[in-house]
Each structure stands twice: as structure tokens, then as C-alpha cells.
Amino acid sequence: MNNNITNSIAQLFFNTSFFAFLFLIIIAFNLCLFAYLYFQYRIYKKNPKKANNFKANEYEKIKLLKNQNFTESNKLIATTNELNELTSQLDNILVRIINKPLAKLVNDFLDEQIKQIVKLDKNSSDFHSESDNLPFYTKLFNDFHFGVDKLININIKNPLYNWVYSPSFLISESDFRKLNGISGINKKLLVEKLRIEDIVFTDLNKKYEVNVLTESPIKAQKTVLTVRNILMNDYVDNERIESYVQQANFFFTEHCKKIGKEILESLNIFISSSSLHRHFGFLAFRYSFGQNVLSHSLETAFLTAHLAALIELDSELSLKCGLLHDIGKSNDDNGKESHTITGAKLAEQFQLPDDIKYTIANHHNKHIDNTYCRLTQIADKLSAARIGARSDSSLLFKQLKDELKKIVDKTINNFHTTILLGQSGRRLMIWLETKNQNQLLSNEQIIEMVEKIKAEIAKNPITNHFPIKVVIRYNFEHSFNTKS
């Protein structure tokens, strides 16, 4: 019994001693920590700088790194500005190159730059001695024989199509009855199915002059083909007219496919898309300022490929960029949409390479960051500016027609008007269509309208150079001359 009590007391004393010892250790640690903190406090009170020395050093390091980063950032900004300046200078140089007249362009840029690139010798066999005094661009064009007539043997002109924007031809009285139909029903159907503005018949004493009103050469070609089909057959009705229109559309489309395929394959460009062949073939019947678009595309393609070869770029890709840059002009129903937008859509449809897509969409832009597009842009300007490429008479005729259209729209603003300018600009025909079915014109109103048109034509510096016979048709025909 006593032994058990003794053991219990000993065990209790051991446990109590252990906890007491642990407690003393904790108290001693806290006292040491307090003493250290108090010592640090005394040092800080006496010398704060010494106490914060470590923090100051770290701060200086951070500040130094920040300054270094700021310096590097300034260098990067300066480099970026220099690059932007160089890019701007390059753009200005290229803009001057593209916008200068052809002679200045060559004298200031192409003549020296291309010579330096290819290191041409004046005695080189590439250019004969008789042309040594010619500008370099002339030698370049002569050497590569630019122009569709020399590049490929293909007839791209229709003899019935003239440069005044509307086919005009004579037919007999019986053919007139066939084309016009009873009360003009055949003519109305033709206009509707061919999607042209109008077909106008002018009585010339037992013969009729036919004028197809459309500014689309493609629609003009289809109309002429349809008229030929009608005149070759004795009997015509609505069903046959629709059939003739379909035949003309099919024949014309197949003809354009053949043109496109033959030209592309002659250039070793083998594309299986018949739709692309068709669009490319359409360019043979499109004109821009008197210049055939197919001819212009071929010139641009060959010049782009040659320039690319001189600076060791991909000539084949450059050829395709130049060849297809105006493919958007093939679309006859794009309305007011730019040919670059239409062309970009076609490029996506045909899954053309990215460089070609970019060139088609951007070759008229001022800022270009694609080398192939820039070369195509230069070649495009060279082809358009080449002497004889664009007809001055065609430009003047278009300018005259635009001015006369403005005068007519300004003077006769209450009517829908259609005009046809023929005889090299010396005969203007105006068709009036009332916007309101109940709107009628008296003889006095017609005469007043005539006097206004005559006065506007007389005071316009573009339209008053020579007499113009103006014919107004509204239920009856009224004609007058602008000069006696």
C-alpha cells in the first residue's frame, strides 16, 4: 500500500517537473526575443540609416533595374520610330513612282534602279544599238512585246460593238416587226430577259436603226447574239425568244470559258475551275478607259513577272498576281461595288493563294505591306500609262457623256431619264419616263425643258465645243440643235 502511494507521488513529481521545465524554456525564449527586439530598437533610435541599410540596397537595385528597362524601352521606341520613318519614306518614294507620268517615272526610278539590279550593259545583245538612246522602259516593252495582239492570237472584239458604249446596226422593216412584236411585246421581253436598259428603233424610211441601250459590253454581246438568232428564224414567239436568250447566254459563256482556259494554259497555268476560266474570259469583253481589260491584265502579268525576276522573287506567283489583279471587273452584276471587293470574293471562292488574294483586294490601296502586290501595282500603272494603251478619244467621249448626263439629270429632275450618245458625241437621245403615271407634259413644258438643256449645254466648257443634236422622246419626238 505504501509502495503504491510512493510510486504515485514519484510519477506526479516527474510529470510536474517536466511541464515546469518546458514552461521555463518558453519563458526564456520570450525573454531573449524581447531583449533582441529591444536591442534593435535602441540601434534604430541611434542610427536609422544603418537599420534600413538592407532595404535601401534592395530599393536601389529595383530602381536601377527600372532605369535600365526605361532605357531599353526608349531604345525600342526610337528603333520603332526609325522603322516607321523608313517605311514612310519608302511609301512616299513608291507613291511618287506610281503617280508620276511614265516618262518621269522611268527617268527618275526604273531606268537607274532596274539597270543596277540586273547590271545591264549598254552593249548587251538584249537591246540593239538602234535603241540605245531610248528610255529603259521603252526597251523593256519592246523586248517583251507587251500587248494582247502580240502575246496570243485571239480575237477579242466584236465587229458590231463600237466604242460609243452601245451596239448600233440597221435592219429591214420585216425584221423590225419580228424584233418589236405586236405593241412592242417582243422588245419588252428581250429587255427583261437580257437585263438591258432598252432597245430603241429609229425609223429611217423602210429601214430601222437598232440601238441597244446598255453600258455593259457583255450584255451587249449577248443581245447581239440573241438578235442574230431571232433574225435567222422565220417565226418568233415568247417561248422561242426565251430559248434564243438562253442559247445566247450558253454560247457566250462557253466562248468565254474557252478564251480563259486557252490563255491560262498558254501561260502554263492549269486550273481546273471552269468558273474561273469563264470569269477570266469575260475580261476579253470588258474595257476600262478604252483599254481592253484582258490585254491590260496580260501586260501587267508579264511586266510583274519580269520585275519579280529582276529582284529574285517568285516569277510564277508574280505572273498570277498580275494576271488576276482585275478579275473583279469580270462581274457584270456587281452594281456599285468596287472591283477589288468583287475580286476578293472571287479569290475566296476559287481558294487562290494568299498573296494573290491580297493583291486582288489591295492593288489600289496607298499603303501596301506585300511585295507581290506592290510590284503588281507598279506594273498596273505602267500598263495603263503606256503610250497608246488608253484611247484619248474614248476618255473625252466618256467625259462628254458624263457631263451631258449631269445636265439632263439636273434639268429634268422629275423624270427617270435614259440617254444614248452617238455619232462621236454629236447626237444625244433622251428618253423620258414619268415617275408618276398621272404626270403628263404639255408642249409648253417640253419647250421650256428644251431651252434649259440648250442653255446648260451652251455654257458648259466641255459640251459647247461643237453642235450636238438633241432628241427628246416622250410620247412624241422633239429634236433641236444646240448650235445653228
Swiss-Prot record:
Q: Does the keyword Iron apply?
A: no
| Any one GO CC term of the record | plasma membrane
Q: Which residues cross the membrane?
A: 18-38
Biological process per Gene Ontology, one example term: mRNA catabolic process
Subcellular localization, per the record? Cell membrane
Question: Cross-referenced CDD domains, in alphabetical order?
Answer: HDc (cd00077)
How is the protein disposed in the membrane?
A: Single-pass membrane protein
Query: What's the name of the protein?
Result: Ribonuclease Y
Q: Which organism is it from?
A: Mycoplasma genitalium (strain ATCC 33530 / DSM 19775 / NCTC 10195 / G37) (Mycoplasmoides genitalium)
